[in-house]
Structure formats: structure tokens, C-alpha cells
From Swiss-Prot:
<protein>
    <recommendedName>
        <fullName>Uncharacterized protein BH0010</fullName>
    </recommendedName>
</protein>
């Protein structure tokens, strides 16, 4: 098997490439609902066997990077985060495969310290819509 490499990963915000991304995380969380009823008893006992169904899927993306003063992509990311506007984040691998995520930034942070020597940024994005991007389409 071949590893999926981070090198070649591309992040865009509203069609503008964001430079110096050092980390990207795409997460899913499934909410569940307890649907246990009176008939859901373990055979031969008086103990309920809990039953659950998936009731909602939540999705987020998080990114971190090194701040570049004049990078158009980082400027666009910060602009939409500060304004609470909807945005499109496109995340593709070295082959151009990935996702186009529509939503909004829930957090944005810039941080610097003597030990790090440079400013870094991070942002978390709430996904409301997702579509698959194929390497065939990005050529």
C-alpha cells in the first residue's frame, strides 16, 4: 500500500490558494438518538438492550499555517472569518482529489511567540455542504 502524502496538498478559500498551510484536519461527528422501547429487552431478562440511530452528522475542517504578510489566500481566509461570511474551502491532494466544503469559519486565531520566532494562524470551519472534487475536473 502507498501512503497518502501531505506534500502536494492544496487549500483554497473562495478560489484563492492559501500559502504556508502546515496542518489540515477534516472531521465528522455523528449525533445519535436513543430509540429504546419497551420491547427492547434482552431475552430471558428484565434488562433493556439500548438501541440507537444516527440522527445528525456534523462536519468541521481545521487548518494551521505560518502567517505571510501579503498572501492573498490568507487575507481572504481572515476576511471571511472576521465577517462571518459563508465561504468555500477546497481541499485537494497531490492528484487533485478531495472536497469542496461550503460553510463559515467559527474561529480564527493568530499567535506569535519568541520561542516560535514567527506568527502562525489557525482557523476552524463549520461545513454545511460538501461535494467531491476529482483530479479529472481540476485539469
Amino acid at each position: 500500500m502507498t501512503e497518502k502524502r501531505f506534500a502536494g496538498t492544496r487549500i483554497e478559500v473562495n478560489g484563492i490558494v492559501v500559502a504556508k498551510i502546515t496542518s489540515f484536519t477534516h472531521s465528522l461527528e455523528v449525533e445519535e438518538a436513543d430509540v429504546t422501547g419497551l420491547g427492547d429487552v434482552d431475552e430471558g431478562s428484565s434488562v433493556f438492550r439500548q438501541k440507537f440511530i444516527a440522527s445528525a452528522i456534523g462536519e468541521t475542517a481545521a487548518m494551521e499555517g505560518v502567517v505571510l504578510v501579503d498572501d492573498a489566500g490568507q487575507s481572504e481566509l481572515k476576511r471571511v472569518a472576521e465577517s462571518g461570511q459563508d465561504a468555500v474551502v477546497k481541499h485537494t491532494d497531490e492528484n487533485g482529489n478531495g472536497y469542496e466544503l461550503t460553510g463559515f469559519f467559527t474561529t480564527y486565531e493568530e499567535e506569535g511567540s519568541v520561542s516560535e520566532g514567527v506568527y502562525t494562524f489557525s482557523g476552524e470551519f463549520r461545513v454545511n455542504e460538501k461535494s467531491v472534487v476529482s483530479g479529472d475536473e481540476s485539469a
